[in-house]
């Protein structure tokens, strides 16, 4: 049986010794399999490898068949989101971080020789992860790489003071809120910031978006799950604080002023993630987050 993916990219978290060591191990293993390997520029610079093919993330997305991301969930979020902007290249996550909710392959010999080997042969399962995009006041656009979220888009106070929001969904008034902010999350992000704020867990394959209030000053404010085909308009209404902050997957802060409008909707691109054939999302919920753990 031949490999389904012949040109393989490696992307690692920068300035982390254990990641660099794993990248070197992975490179040697892939070489043994006779595969063509390209390493992301900064990832290669962190290793002792010489005379290797290197490329930017954009070049990797356009030239490679698959990308292996080594690191934690944060690095996976950043790399897979940027790769998806340029092509539909599938990604595989190898965990060298803490939780490893998205980077589902273990960083050990067994995972390389069995799990990764099988995936590269084409014996895998696939998750298509939706993303969100935003614009401010209909015309102020952030650079492309800073306007797409895989986990969530959050609007929060820049200091610890409440502010007001007015939310419309598909052009219809939905609700007002005063509090510390609002999270608009993809199903993938429902186990991240949104979950910490009391939101529901959504399966990554679900075609939904969840709006989760952050410390709403109300006894009856609850998360709201809507179709990912909906368009969400959020107006910044009043302030105790001079400004609020919009962030994407915890990065790329954009300052918002009073009376500005933020429009959020589904992005055209999706992230394609490859797992082992027997991957079970609900196993990951139980094992990584202790979901529905029986206590007695």
From Swiss-Prot:
Required cofactor(s): a divalent metal cation
Active-site residues, Swiss-Prot/TrEMBL: 73
GO MF: ATP binding; metal ion binding; NAD binding; NAD+ kinase activity
Family matches, as InterPro entries: ATP-NAD_kinase_N (IPR017438), ATP-NAD_kinase_PpnK-typ_C (IPR017437), NAD/diacylglycerol_kinase_sf (IPR016064), NADK (IPR002504)
Signal peptide positions (record): none
GO terms, biological process: NAD metabolic process; NADP biosynthetic process
PANTHER family cross-referenced by the UniProt entry: NAD KINASE
Protein name per Swiss-Prot or TrEMBL: NAD kinase
The organism of origin for this protein: Francisella tularensis subsp. tularensis (strain SCHU S4 / Schu 4)
Native organism taxonomy: Bacteria, Pseudomonadati, Pseudomonadota, Gammaproteobacteria, Thiotrichales
């Amino acid at each position: 049986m031949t490999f389904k993916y012949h040109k393989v990219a490696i992307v690692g978290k920068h300035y982390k010794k254990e990641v660099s060591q794993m990248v070197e191990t992975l490179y040697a293993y892939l070489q043994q399999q006779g595969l063509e390997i390209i390493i992301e520029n900064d990832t290669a610079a962190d290793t002792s490898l010489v005379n290797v093919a290197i490329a930017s993330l954009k070049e990797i997305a356009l030239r490679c068949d698959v990308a292996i991301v080594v690191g934690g969930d944060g690095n996976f979020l950043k790399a897979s989101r940027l790769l998806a902007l340029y092509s539909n290249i599938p990604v595989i996550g190898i965990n060298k971080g803490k939780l490893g909710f998205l980077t589902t392959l273990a960083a050990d010999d067994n995972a390389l020789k069995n799990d990764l080997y099988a995936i590269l042969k084409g014996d895998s399962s696939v998750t298509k992860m939706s993303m969100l995009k935003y614009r401010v006041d209909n015309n102020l656009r952030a650079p492309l790489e800073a306007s797409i979220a895989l986990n969530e888009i959050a609007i929060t106070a820049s200091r610890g003071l409440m502010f007001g929001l007015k939310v419309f969904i598909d052009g219809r008034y939905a609700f007002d809120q005063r509090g510390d902010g609002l999270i608009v999350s993809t199903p993938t992000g429902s186990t991240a910031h949104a979950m910490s704020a009391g939101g529901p867990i959504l399966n990554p394959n679900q075609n939904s978006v969840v709006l989760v209030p952050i410390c709403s000053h109300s006894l009856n404010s609850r998360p709201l799950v809507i179709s990912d085909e909906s368009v969400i308009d959020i107006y910044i209404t009043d302030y105790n604080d001079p400004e609020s902050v919009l962030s994407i997957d915890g990065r790329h802060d954009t300052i918002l002023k009073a009376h500005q409008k933020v429009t959020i909707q589904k992005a055209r691109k999706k992230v394609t993630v490859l797992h082992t054939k027997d991957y079970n999302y609900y196993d990951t919920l139980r094992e990584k987050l202790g979901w529905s753990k029986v206590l007695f």
